[in-house]
């Protein structure tokens, strides 16, 4: 069956997989299953940094997921959205709360070094786009909001 998507590309956004020992945020498929499906149906995979991290409770998870999708040729994009082990103004520990980077939210595991490492791995893995999605304090000015996004952009260290 052929579909005309008028240039749009279907992408699977990875969310945390179901792990019986922990309360899921989404509880969907594993990255390995999503990569297999994406390869089979010729669609891309988007890695949401925070969702990979909260799944494994480790900043290394996002990097590992980026590498895995890149090796299979299905890595389409990476969105930087933080996560962390502590309760913050954005929610409980390990919430899919789109925490800002560590420079703006110390409890976030999304440090400048992790952003750079993952951005570089994504580019090397054939990624088509990088993005950022984060919550901001409700009273943040426009300048503060833009500064938070700029911190992520600069941490990518794009050349």
What kind of feature is each model-predicted range?
Residues 12-14, 46-49:
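Short beta-strands and strand-loop turn motifs
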Residues 1-41, 145-151:
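Active-site acidic/histidine proton-transfer and metal-coordination neighborhood
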Residues 1, 18-31, 51-65, 139-140:
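Active-site glycine- and acidic-residue-rich loops that bind
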Residues 3-5, 49, 94:
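A residue-identity detector for tryptophan
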């Amino acid at each position: 069956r052929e579909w005309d998507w008028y240039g749009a590309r279907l992408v699977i956004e990875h969310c945390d997989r179901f792990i019986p020992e922990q309360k899921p945020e989404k509880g969907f498929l594993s990255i390995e299953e999503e990569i297999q499906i994406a390869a089979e149906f010729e669609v891309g995979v988007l890695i949401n940094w925070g969702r990979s991290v909260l799944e494994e409770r480790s900043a290394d998870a996002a990097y590992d997921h980026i590498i895995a999708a890149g090796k299979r040729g299905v890595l389409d994009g990476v969105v930087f959205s933080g996560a962390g082990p502590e309760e913050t103004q954005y929610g409980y520990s390990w919430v899919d709360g789109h925490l800002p980077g560590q420079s703006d939210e110390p409890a976030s595991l999304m440090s400048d070094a992790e952003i750079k490492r993952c951005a570089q791995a994504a580019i090397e893995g054939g990624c088509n786009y990088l993005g950022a999605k984060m919550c901001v304090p409700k009273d943040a000015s426009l300048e503060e909001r833009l500064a938070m996004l700029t911190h992520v952009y600069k941490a990518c260290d794009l050349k």
